[in-house]
């Protein structure tokens, strides 16, 4: 029983947030901190490369950044049929930012919490995208961008028509249209948030469960834990990249749908 409680306590400790209080309106400080750090890493790397960019023989980092920019720009050109001067940088930022936040999950699960413990911090969850409040924050930003691009494309009157006269073009059915279209609109940010959160939370939990194997006084279990940790980390590289790509891709597609939606 003691071992079970110890295991349960270990898992619970790693799933607890560093927060401002116990009320409903508390803030997850660790999610906020690592989100800012991830964004700062992206800005630092790309701004440094941009300042040192040369038309001559490029450095390896410049080649990497140029490949990333060209790749994202190609995706935006194929999927967003409107002015791309803001959507391209937005897509690049989303992909890199989400990828860096996801990649924090590859750090050994005990390293950052133990480091924080040295400074008197009891709880710390380092993966912002494994926190539903973090992914909802990202998706709410996308939600407002969808509304912005719809209004920019159709005007306020066109925006109202989209959600009151579709799919049934009759004044008496405006409440039905509004209900249907509102659900469709709200489903976009909700699905974005929960898809990213679900995958990253599951990945984080698997790492924690594998780490529990190291607590056993059994050489076979410890050895199996090392093998499983390495195997899952290699597979998880694909997961974190794919989830960043899906979030970025769906954002571009949703913005394109809002911008190019046909009049009814």
From Swiss-Prot:
Cell membrane keyword on record: yes
Molecular function via GO: proton-transporting ATP synthase activity, rotational mechanism
SUPFAM superfamilies named in the record: F1F0 ATP synthase subunit A
Pfam families: ATP-synt_A
GO CC, any one term: proton-transporting ATP synthase complex
GO biological process: proton motive force-driven plasma membrane ATP synthesis
Membrane-spanning parts: 27-47, 87-107, 131-151, 172-192, 196-216, 230-250
Compartments, record wording: Cell inner membrane
Domain of life: Bacteria
PROSITE patterns noted in UniProt: ATPASE_A
Keywords, in A-Z order: ATP synthesis, Cell inner membrane, Cell membrane, CF(0), Hydrogen ion transport, Ion transport, Membrane, Transmembrane, Transmembrane helix, Transport
Protein topology in the membrane: Multi-pass membrane protein
Principal subcellular localisation of the protein: membrane
Annotated InterPro entries: ATP_syn_F0_a_bact/chloroplast, ATP_synth_F0_asu, ATP_synth_F0_asu_AS, F0_ATP_A_sf
Job of this protein: Key component of the proton channel; it plays a direct role in the translocation of protons across the membrane.
Record-stated family: Belongs to the ATPase A chain family.
Quaternary structure and partners: F-type ATPases have 2 components, CF(1) - the catalytic core - and CF(0) - the membrane proton channel. CF(1) has five subunits: alpha(3), beta(3), gamma(1), delta(1), epsilon(1). CF(0) has three main subunits: a(1), b(2) and c(9-12). The alpha and beta chains form an alternating ring which encloses part of the gamma chain. CF(1) is attached to CF(0) by a central stalk formed by the gamma and epsilon chains, while a peripheral stalk is formed by the delta and b chains.
Protein name: ATP synthase subunit a
Organism this protein belongs to: Pasteurella multocida (strain Pm70)
Name of the coding gene: atpB
């Amino acid at each position: 029983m003691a071992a079970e409680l110890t295991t349960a306590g270990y898992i619970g400790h790693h799933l607890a947030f560093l927060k401002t209080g116990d009320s409903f309106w508390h803030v997850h400080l660790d999610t906020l901190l690592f989100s800012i750090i991830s964004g700062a890493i992206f800005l630092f790397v790309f701004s440094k490369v941009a300042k040192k960019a040369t038309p001559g023989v490029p450095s390896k980092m410049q080649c990497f950044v140029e490949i990333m920019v060209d790749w994202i720009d190609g995706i935006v050109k194929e999927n967003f049929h409107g002015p791309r001067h803001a959507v391209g940088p937005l897509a690049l930022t989303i992909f890199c930012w989400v990828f860096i936040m996801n990649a924090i999950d590859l750090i050994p699960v005990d390293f950052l919490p133990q480091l924080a413990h040295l400074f008197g911090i009891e709880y710390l969850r380092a993966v912002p995208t494994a926190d539903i409040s973090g992914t909802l924050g990202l998706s709410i930003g996308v939600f407002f961008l969808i509304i912005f691009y719809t209004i920019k494309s159709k005007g306020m009157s066109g925006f109202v028509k989209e959600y009151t006269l579709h799919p049934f073009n009759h004044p008496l059915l405006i409440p039905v249209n509004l209900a249907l279209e509102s659900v469709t609109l709200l489903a976009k940010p909700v699905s974005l948030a929960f898809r990213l959160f679900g995958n990253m939370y599951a990945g984080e939990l698997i790492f924690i469960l594998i780490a529990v194997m190291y607590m056993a006084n059994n050489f076979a279990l410890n050895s199996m834990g090392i093998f499983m940790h390495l195997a899952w980390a290699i597979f998880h590289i694909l997961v974190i990249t794919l989830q960043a790509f899906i979030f970025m891709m769906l954002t571009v597609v949703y913005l394109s749908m809002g911008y190019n939606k046909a009049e009814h």
